[in-house]
């Protein structure tokens, strides 16, 4: 073969190779376009791209709120991956809410996400049953009307010790975190287990202490690599204390559970079933064929009371009380409403009366908007692949959530969102403009504005869950205990507003103690002190 023939052959081959390469690139690009989108290439939000991720994980604690806000506005219609203190979460845009809101536990699980968030391997969190949430939804919430008098009765008893009588012009100094933990612990104990343990000091201390130690354990262990946690956790005093609380719960509850089961099996004619959460839990377990060991039920009761009842309600009450002191102009309109809805006095309050307190309800919602339990909500672990409406596939095992805090502060959805407007969620003009009666008289409501806070038909309650109000979650697995928590919160706060003057310790010039932000969580200042003075008047 001559040199010219070889040259011509190479030229033809070169042209073919170039053509094949062009076709190959086109096909690869076409396949990428046709393939379902994945989450592998979503943008990542971290404190600094110049720092190693173990440093970014530690910096998540003080800077998470600002990072979530920045990610939300930078990638508003896109998913982004956030480096957290112990891993990563995928923060989703609002356009995926409808895709996910109705999915059940087999597809996306709030229980598994909670277990992961709370480091369940080291904190005694259980996720083996939905009986707790089922009992709340099917038994507790429908029973609220008959439970309110019991809660009030217990609060009356508790107030005499935690809020003693004062002489005229005398102020007493109290830590509000301790005050509300005590009030909620005593009142909820009666609802949860009746007379058996409601005044048991060991139980009250254990339920409060467990939540405190859980928080410490999470903060310490999360930045530590997962393979080192089994070596570190056993040496933490907080894990020792949690283990003691679990052992105590089993020692106190197991005999009660066993005795109730024995009485039910023997059909003892002299036995009357208690009307409390523990009994409803046992009965529902029988109905659904899910008979749990007594020790396991004891642990569930500890987790329920410590985390779902006492801790969350205490945080809400602290924030709301701080907000009231910071904005005293709201006190008189609230007192007027409480007097109107409780004409026979607070001690004879009913569920219907507390539901009618729309101003207080709105104030609590606004307080929660400024200081939600967490700036991320709808935490779910994907249990099996989920395909979203635009073809994006969420693979099994990823942790997803929505930027609830940033959404609630978005001017697209809330008018003038950076201003605290305690009555913005009221519908009736006389309540909405209680601070400006001249506006209420003229009923100046802008019907053309479709933002949530001014839309006349928009859901507005403290416990209302919407696409822009996710303080209690969203969708099928929304917090079922929010109705009981809200009712207890309003019961306690209405008593304080009616019966007491309160202020920050340190005099008239004292300012609202700054919140404590730990990662996505926004806590009130737990060391702050308030001064209380009993009003010397009858109501």
What spans do the regions from the language model cover?
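N-terminal membrane-proximal hinge/A-helix region immediately C-terminal to the signal-anchor transmembrane segment
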Residues: 2-132, 150, 468
């Amino acid at each position: 073969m001559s040199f010219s023939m070889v040259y011509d052959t190479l030229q033809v081959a070169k042209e073919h190779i170039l053509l094949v390469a062009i076709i190959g690139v086109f096909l690869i690009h076409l396949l990428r376009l046709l393939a379902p989108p994945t989450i592998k290439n979503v943008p990542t939000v971290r404190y600094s791209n110049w720092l190693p991720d173990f440093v970014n994980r530690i910096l998540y604690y003080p800077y998470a709120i600002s990072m979530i806000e920045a990610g939300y506005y930078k990638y508003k219609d896109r998913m982004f991956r956030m480096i957290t203190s112990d891993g990563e979460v995928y923060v989703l845009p609002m356009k995926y809410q409808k895709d996910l809101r109705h999915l059940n536990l087999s597809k996306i699980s709030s229980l598994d996400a909670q277990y992961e968030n709370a480091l369940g391997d080291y904190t005694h969190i259980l996720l083996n049953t939905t009986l707790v949430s089922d009992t709340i939804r099917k038994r507790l919430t429908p029973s609220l009307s008959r439970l309110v008098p019991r809660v009030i009765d217990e609060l009356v008893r508790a107030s005499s010790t935690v809020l003693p009588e004062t002489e005229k012009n005398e102020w007493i100094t109290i830590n509000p975190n301790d005050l509300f933990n005590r009030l909620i612990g005593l009142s909820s104990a009666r609802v949860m287990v009746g007379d058996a343990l409601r005044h048991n000091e060991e139980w009250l201390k254990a339920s409060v202490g467990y939540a405190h130690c859980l928080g410490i354990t999470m903060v310490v262990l999360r930045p530590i690599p997962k393979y080192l946690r089994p070596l570190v956790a056993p040496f933490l005093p907080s894990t020792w204390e949690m283990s003691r609380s679990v052992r105590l719960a089993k020692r106190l509850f197991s005999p009660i559970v066993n005795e109730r089961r024995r009485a039910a099996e023997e059909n003892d004619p002299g036995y009357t079933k208690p009307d409390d959460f523990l009994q409803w839990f046992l009965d529902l377990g029988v109905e659904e064929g899910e008979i749990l060991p007594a020790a396991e039920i004891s642990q569930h009761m500890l987790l329920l009371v410590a985390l779902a009842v006492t801790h969350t309600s205490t945080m809400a009450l602290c924030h709301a009380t701080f907000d009231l002191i910071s904005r005293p102009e709201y006190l008189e309109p609230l007192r007027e409403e409480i007097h109107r809805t409780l004409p026979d006095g607070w001690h004879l309050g009913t569920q219907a009366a507390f539901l009618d307190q729309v101003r207080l309800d709105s104030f609590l919602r606004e307080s929660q908007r400024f200081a939600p339990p967490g700036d991320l909500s709808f935490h779910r672990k994907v249990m099996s692949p989920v395909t979203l409406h635009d073809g994006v596939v969420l693979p099994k095992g990823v942790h997803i959530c929505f930027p609830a805090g940033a959404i609630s502060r978005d001017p697209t959805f809330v008018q003038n969102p950076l201003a605290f407007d305690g009555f913005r969620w009221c519908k009736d003009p006389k309540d909405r403009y209680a601070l400006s009666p001249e506006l209420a008289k003229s009923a100046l409501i802008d019907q053309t504005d479709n933002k949530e806070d001014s839309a006349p038909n928009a859901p507005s309650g403290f416990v209302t869950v919407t696409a822009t109000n996710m303080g209690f979650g969203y969708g099928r697995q929304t917090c079922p205990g929010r109705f009981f928590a809200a009712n207890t919160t309003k019961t306690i706060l209405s008593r304080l507003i009616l019966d007491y003057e309160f202020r920050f310790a340190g005099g008239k010039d004292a300012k609202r103690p700054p919140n404590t932000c730990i990662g996505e969580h926004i806590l009130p200042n737990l060391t702050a002190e308030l001064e209380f003075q009993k009003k010397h008047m009858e109501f």
